[in-house]
Design a protein with these regions (language model features):
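Signature of Gram-negative outer-membrane beta-barrel scaffolds
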Residues: 97-210
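Outer-membrane beta-barrel domain signature, strongest for Gram-negative TonB-dependent receptors
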Residues: 1-99, 103-111, 127-132, 136-145, ...
Length: 210
C-alpha cells in the first residue's frame, strides 16, 4: 500500500510569487502625397516583464534550502523595444511595399539558493553518522577522543567553529544576461499582369546578434 503521508510537501519559507507585465505599442500612419499617395506606417513597441519567485526548495519540515523573492535572489526580467517602418504604394500595375524592422532585447536571470538554519545539523548528521565511528577508532590509539554521541556536531567539531555558524549566509548565486539585437529589411511586391493573373515577389533579410 502507498502511505499518503509521503505525498506531503512542506513550506517553512516564503513562497511569494510576484509577476509584472507591462507594455506599450503605438501605430502611426502618414499619407505622403509627395510620393504619389504612398503610405508610411510606423509601429513602435516596448515591453517589460519581471518575475520574482520564492520557494522552500527542500519541501521538507526542516529549514534546509530556500530561495528569496528578491530582485537579485531568484528572478527573471525581460525588456524589449522594437521599431518597424513600412512604406507602401502603387506604381502602375505594381503594388509595392518596403520596410525595416529593429528590435533590442535584454534578458536578466538571477538564480540563487540559500541554506537555512537546519542545513548544518542535517548535513553533519548525514556525514557524521557515517564517519564518526571509524574516525574514533582511528584516533583512539593516539588518545584523541571523538564525540560520537551527537553527529549533528560533526562539522563544528572538525572545523573548530561554534555550532550553527559554519554555513551562515551560505548558498549559491548565478547571474545570467543575454542581449539580442535584430535588424531586418523586407519588401513585398505584386504585379497585376492581367485582371486574372498576379505575380507576387517577396524578400526579407534578417541579421540577429546575441
Amino acid at each position: 500500500t502507498i502511505d499518503a503521508s509521503q505525498r506531503l510537501g512542506y513550506a517553512n519559507r516564503s513562497t511569494e510569487q510576484d509577476t509584472k507585465d507591462k507594455g506599450l505599442s503605438a501605430e502611426v500612419n502618414w499619407q505622403m502625397d509627395a510620393l504619389g499617395g504612398a503610405s508610411l506606417t510606423s509601429i513602435t513597441a516596448y515591453r517589460d516583464w519581471t518575475s520574482l519567485n520564492a520557494m522552500d526548495a527542500d519541501f521538507s519540515g526542516a529549514d534546509l534550502i530556500f530561495r528569496d523573492a528578491d530582485p537579485k535572489g531568484h528572478s527573471t526580467a525581460f525588456e524589449t523595444f522594437s521599431q518597424e517602418l513600412r512604406l507602401t504604394g502603387t506604381s502602375g500595375r505594381v503594388d509595392w511595399m518596403i520596410g525595416a524592422f529593429w528590435a533590442d532585447e535584454t534578458l536578466d536571470r538571477y538564480d540563487q539558493y540559500q541554506v537555512g538554519a537546519h542545513y548544518e545539523p542535517y548535513l553533519s548528521t548525514l556525514v557524521g553518522s557515517q564517519v564518526l565511528a571509524g574516525l574514533a577508532a582511528q584516533l583512539a590509539p593516539m588518545n584523541i577522543s571523538v564525540n560520537t554521541a551527537n553527529p549533528a556536531l560533526f562539522f563544528s567539531q572538525v572545523s573548530g567553529r561554534p555550532y550553527g555558524t559554519g554555513f551562515i549566509g551560505g548558498g549559491s548565486q548565478d547571474y545570467y544576461q543575454q542581449k539580442a539585437r535584430s535588424l531586418a529589411l523586407f519588401t513585398n511586391n505584386t504585379w497585376h499582369a492581367t485582371d486574372q493573373f498576379d505575380l507576387t515577389l517577396g524578400l526579407r533579410y534578417t541579421h540577429d546578434r546575441k
